[in-house]
């Protein structure tokens, strides 16, 4: 009986001394995201007709995705979702976080067309860059980011969706396949990278 009582006292004391164990619930306590690879560099033309390079955004967390304005299937899902995340990021967006949407249809997506597209989805333009460029450069860049794109016989473009999050040092840290990923997880991953130095 004394042995059992002593054992209970030891266990209770150990539990009390160890304190409550907290389960991580936010981005500040989650495991660091893996380092996938250096992000492919680019210099393209923005919706304002100005050159923008990935290197210009060094020091920010950058989400890079590929879209085109005439897409009527999946791009209209991805861009509004990113707009929602833009709003949820609040004051971090633009100062510490940037979005880059690169057209895979540069023949039709001129800077003026991209500007209208950005306005249609409520993009916060100082922090969200819609980019176009020469066809071979865009196609090579898409391939290096892991995005497949090909023009179909009817002139439409079939393409895969892969959104990459690049850290402040230009390293891809996470990639989302498709367009139906959780916007809150996307936001948390961005916040996690913001907390890194």
Give a label for each model feature.
Residues 128, 139, 143-152, 156-164:
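Structural micro-motif
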Residues 54-82:
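Short active-site neighborhood of thiol/selenol oxidoreductases, capturing the structured segment around
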């Amino acid at each position: 009986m004394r042995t059992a009582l002593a054992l209970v006292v030891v266990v209770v004391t150990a539990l009390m001394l160890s304190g409550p164990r907290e389960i991580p619930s936010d981005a500040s306590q989650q495991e660091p995201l893996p380092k996938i690879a250096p992000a492919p560099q680019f210099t393209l033309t923005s919706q304002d007709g100005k050159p923008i390079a990935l290197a210009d955004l060094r020091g920010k967390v950058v989400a890079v995705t590929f879209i085109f304005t005439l897409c009527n299937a999946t791009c209209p899902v991805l861009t509004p979702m990113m707009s929602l995340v833009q709003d949820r990021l609040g004051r971090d967006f633009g100062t510490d976080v940037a979005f880059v949407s690169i057209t895979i249809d540069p023949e039709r997506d001129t800077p003026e067309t991209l500007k209208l597209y950005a306005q249609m989805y409520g993009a916060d333009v100082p922090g969200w860059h819609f980019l176009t460029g020469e066809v071979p450069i865009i196609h090579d860049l898409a391939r290096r980011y892991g995005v497949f794109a090909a023009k179909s016989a009817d002139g439409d473009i079939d393409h895969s969706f892969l959104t990459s999050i690049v850290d402040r040092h230009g390293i891809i840290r996470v990639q989302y396949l498709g367009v139906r990923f959780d916007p809150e997880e996307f936001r948390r991953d961005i916040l996690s990278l913001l907390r890194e130095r």
